[in-house]
């Protein structure tokens, strides 16, 4: 017998663009996406629908065919989600990449996702163009995504993304069979998985509609909602709510290009924001800023705050709760890319101060297995949590071996997280992670990727990368254990080698430790558990 989410709710089985645009559920001229730094920039439902139809026509005119993958490489913007919807409307598959990626990382993501087109912020084109060209993407399939059209043409020679709007309008790709909603891919987002390099995860129409239905429709709130969107739009933690739920619900959504504490707090206070989703580093930044009189009451309008992507200790949770109004809730959620984001939550108006990540969403199932993979599902029993349900994806793109190891014969996804379900409250608690993935400020870092880079250093003989926890910053950082080929090699040289090749959050901020040997088993696998004692050293 498996654990099951309480209640049930019908999940629409249709294409996601029709789900959003076939029928308006609110005033169609009402601003939905609003630029937090310049509120005169906004997009309504009517404007969004027209833009999406124009993009569908423009992308098809540019040669996009059904199933082609389009990479969107940018910071947040009110038009970001419009481009996502336009890609899907044209029959394409959206993928997002981190603006901080190097050319090396972009090359990998474009290649593995089999991207055919790119839309990029001009600030990152110096890294994107070499990666795109290396994957056979010509410049006439790369568009610049910015508000400064003339500057783009003059400095890059690339077409501005608005050139895609000059081909009239076309209807979106509608599904001739509703069941195709469960098999047709609309987004290809990356997850580190349990081991190895980031993996492309395929989301269907049904996965995303199910995520919205189980989070929002199953738990309506008794007040008018407004949201602030500050998590990076390329990330699975933000994508479902930012790109799809916003226009379905019609709630005003204030978009930050990236998280900035001052703008965040000013926006919440000025526009009476009622709901936000955050990660622990954002919570810590807000706590720091709210010690000043200027911002001490900035969060009083918030009624729902959810924190996910990494654990948050109960003390920090209580400190943040004290900044909110008495009727506000601050709770933790749990999920992953493979579950289309949220899998467990505590719905409003219930609160929690126990450190729980909540209960399973309606329609979701969970079981617990031991280290041998045996089912040991029972209340208050700790083991690896496995998930099954409408939000759980079908698998990774073009990675059959990864799918075989991550999904069992019954369709359960092995999360790699150790936890248990309280027999009385049905709340879930996560104790540790089975997987080696390092979580840095909510972003996932695959040790194998950093190790792969370091192994290319001419003076490094062997290396292992693990996560070390910084109690002050409330996050993990990568640390490298290095066997030197040359004893003159210094820590800063190793750090710089990684910094030049990987994104900032993958850098060795946990330090470098030089050792005589890396512990391995007979098959050559690194025995990272033997580095546990060293890992506890203070940063």
UniProtKB/Swiss-Prot annotation:
UniProt-annotated binding residues for AMP: 188-199
Matches recorded under InterPro entries: AMP-bd_C, AMP-bd_C_sf, AMP-dep_synth/lig_dom, ANL_N_sf
UniProt keyword annotation of Nucleotide-binding present: yes
Chain segments annotated as coiled-coil in the UniProt record: none
GO molecular function, a single term: CoA-ligase activity
Transmembrane segment boundaries: none
Pathway: Secondary metabolite biosynthesis
Region described as AMP-binding: 449-525
Domain of life: Eukaryota
Pfam families: AMP-binding, AMP-binding_C
Record keywords, A-Z: ATP-binding, Ligase, Nucleotide-binding
Class of the enzyme per the UniProt entry, highest EC level: ligase
Function: Phenylacetyl-CoA ligase; part of the gene cluster that mediates the biosynthesis of nigerpyrone and its derivatives carbonarone A and pestalamide A. The biosynthesis pathway begins with the polyketide assembly by epaA to form phenylacetyl triketide precursor from successive condensation of two malonyl-CoA, presumably with one phenylacetyl-CoA starter unit produced by the phenylacetyl-CoA ligase epaB. For the nigerpyrone biosynthesis, the reactive polyketide chain is released as an aldehyde through the R-domain. A nonenzymatic cyclization and dehydration may create nigerpyrone.
Entry's family note: Belongs to the ATP-dependent AMP-binding enzyme family.
PANTHER family: ENZYME, PUTATIVE (AFU_ORTHOLOGUE AFUA_5G14270)-RELATED (PTHR24096:SF265), LONG-CHAIN-FATTY-ACID--COA LIGASE (PTHR24096)
Protein name: Phenylacetyl-CoA ligase epaB
Organism (species): Aspergillus niger (strain ATCC MYA-4892 / CBS 513.88 / FGSC A1513)
């Amino acid at each position: 017998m498996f654990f099951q989410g309480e209640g049930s709710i019908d999940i629409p089985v249709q294409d996601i663009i029709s789900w959003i645009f076939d029928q308006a559920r609110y005033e169609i001229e009402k601003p939905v996406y609003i630029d937090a730094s310049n509120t005169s920039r906004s997009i309504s439902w009517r404007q969004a629908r027209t833009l999406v139809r124009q993009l569908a026509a423009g992308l098809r005119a540019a040669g996009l065919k059904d199933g082609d993958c389009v990479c969107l490489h940018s910071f947040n913007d009110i038009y970001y989600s419009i481009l996502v919807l336009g890609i899907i409307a044209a029959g394409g598959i959206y993928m997002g990449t981190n603006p901080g990626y190097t050319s090396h990382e972009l090359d990998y993501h474009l290649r593995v996702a089999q991207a055919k087109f790119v839309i990029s912020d001009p600030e990152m084109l110096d890294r994107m163009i070499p990666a795109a060209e290396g994957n056979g993407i010509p410049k006439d399939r790369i568009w610049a995504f910015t508000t400064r059209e003339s500057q783009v043409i003059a400095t890059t020679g690339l077409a501005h993304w608005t050139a895609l709007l000059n081909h009239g309008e076309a209807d979106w790709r509608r599904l001739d069979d509703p069941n195709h909603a469960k098999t047709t891919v609309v987004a290809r987002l990356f997850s580190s998985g349990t081991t190895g390099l980031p993996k492309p995860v395929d989301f269907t129409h049904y996965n995303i509609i199910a995520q919205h239905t189980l989070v929002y429709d199953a738990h309506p709130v008794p007040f008018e909602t407004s949201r602030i969107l500050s998590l990076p739009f390329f990330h699975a933690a933000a994508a479902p709510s930012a790109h799809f739920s916003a226009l379905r619900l019609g709630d005003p959504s204030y978009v930050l290009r990236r998280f900035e504490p001052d703008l965040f707090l000013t926006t919440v206070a000025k526009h009476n924001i009622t709901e936000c989703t955050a990660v622990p580093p954002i919570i810590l930044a807000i706590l720091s800023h709210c010690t000043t009189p200027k911002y001490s009451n900035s969060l009083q309008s918030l009624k729902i705050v959810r924190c996910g992507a990494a654990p948050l200790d109960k003390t920090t949770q209580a400190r943040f709760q004290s900044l909110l109004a008495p009727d506000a809730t601050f709770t933790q959620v749990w999920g992953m890319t493979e579950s289309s984001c949220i899998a467990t939550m505590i719905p409003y108006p219930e609160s929690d101060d126990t450190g729980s990540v909540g209960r399973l969403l309606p329609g979701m199932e969970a079981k617990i297995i031991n280290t041998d993979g045996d089912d040991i599902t029972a209340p208050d029993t700790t083991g690896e949590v496995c998930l099954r349900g409408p939000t759980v994806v079908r698998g990774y793109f073009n990675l059959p071996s990864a799918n075989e190891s991550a999904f069992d014969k019954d369709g359960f996804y092995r999360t790699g997280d150790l936890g248990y379900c309280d027999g009385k409250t049905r709340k879930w608690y996560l104790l540790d992670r089975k997987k080696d993935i390092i979580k840095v400020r909510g972003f996932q870092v695959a040790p194998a990727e950093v190790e792969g880079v370091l192994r290319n250093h001419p003076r490094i003989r062997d290396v292992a990368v693990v996560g070390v926890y910084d109690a002050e910053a409330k996050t993990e950082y990568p640390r490298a254990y290095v066997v030197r080929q040359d004893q003159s090699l210094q820590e800063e040289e190793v750090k710089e080698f990684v910094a030049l090749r990987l994104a900032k959050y993958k850098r060795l901020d946990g330090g470098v430790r030089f050792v005589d040997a890396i512990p391995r088993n007979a098959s050559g696998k690194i025995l990272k558990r033997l580095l546990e004692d060293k890992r506890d050293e203070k940063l």
